[in-house]
């Protein structure tokens, strides 16, 4: 396993649409292991493959609270089968937009279909933080960042803040 570099805005790869995965094999599992290690090291709760420059429809996530046992999750070729009409606001952040947080309104519940770490198809309902996080990460697969849901002014402020933060580092 290896920690990979996380791309930050305005890196052009983050606007790229990720491609479906043909099969879950040892090579893909090695990528997912690297992604998980990278996410934990950041630290974060979710990471899409494109955030480390790999344009594949793969997401890793762990929503365990600090001090709890880790609960890694893997989502290959995830798709939303259904989304609730009711929405919920949630303050989001992103490893590709460091040190910036803002409220985004998303469907409160979704039904997902994806392949897991073993390549088995799973259907699952998501709500709360899980629903927010999976929608946020799935946006990455379409080349969309959470700041793209904000006004142009807020988006520009976020990018400016990230650039300023990068210069200071």
Curated annotation (Swiss-Prot):
Database matches in Pfam families: Pep_deformylase
Cofactor descriptive note: Binds 1 Fe(2+) ion.
Signal peptide from the UniProt entry: none
GO molecular function per UniProt: metal ion binding; peptide deformylase activity
InterPro entries named in the record: Peptide_deformylase (IPR023635), Peptide_deformylase_sf (IPR036821)
Cofactor(s), by name: Fe(2+)
Domain of life: Bacteria
Binding site for Fe cation: 94, 136, 140
Keywords of this entry: Hydrolase, Iron, Metal-binding, Protein biosynthesis
One annotated GO biological process: co-translational protein modification
Catalytic activity, EC: 3.5.1.88
Recorded catalytic activity of this chain's protein: N-terminal N-formyl-L-methionyl-[peptide] + H2O = N-terminal L-methionyl-[peptide] + formate
Recorded family membership: Belongs to the polypeptide deformylase family.
Matches recorded under HAMAP family: Pep_deformylase
Role this protein plays: Removes the formyl group from the N-terminal Met of newly synthesized proteins. Requires at least a dipeptide for an efficient rate of reaction. N-terminal L-methionine is a prerequisite for activity but the enzyme has broad specificity at other positions.
Protein name from the UniProt record: Peptide deformylase
Gene that encodes the chain: def
């Amino acid at each position: 396993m290896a920690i990979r570099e996380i791309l930050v805005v305005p890196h052009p790869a983050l606007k790229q649409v990720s491609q479906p995965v043909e099969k879950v094999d040892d090579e893909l599992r090695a990528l997912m292991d690297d992604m998980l290690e990278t996410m934990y090291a950041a630290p974060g709760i979710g990471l899409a493959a494109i955030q480390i420059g790999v344009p594949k429809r793969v997401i890793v996530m762990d929503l365990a609270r600090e001090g709890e046992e880790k609960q890694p999750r893997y989502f290959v070729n995830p798709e939303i089968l259904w989304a609730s009409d009711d929405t919920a606001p949630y303050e989001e952040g992103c490893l590709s937009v460091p040190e910036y947080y803002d409220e985004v309104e998303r469907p409160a519940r979704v039904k997902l279909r994806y392949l897991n770490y073993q390549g088995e198809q799973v259907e699952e309902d998501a709500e709360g933080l899980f629903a927010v996080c999976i929608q946020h990460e799935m946006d990455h697969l379409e080349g969309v960042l959470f700041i793209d849901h904000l006004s142009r002014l807020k988006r520009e402020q976020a990018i400016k803040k990230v650039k300023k933060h990068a210069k200071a580092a």
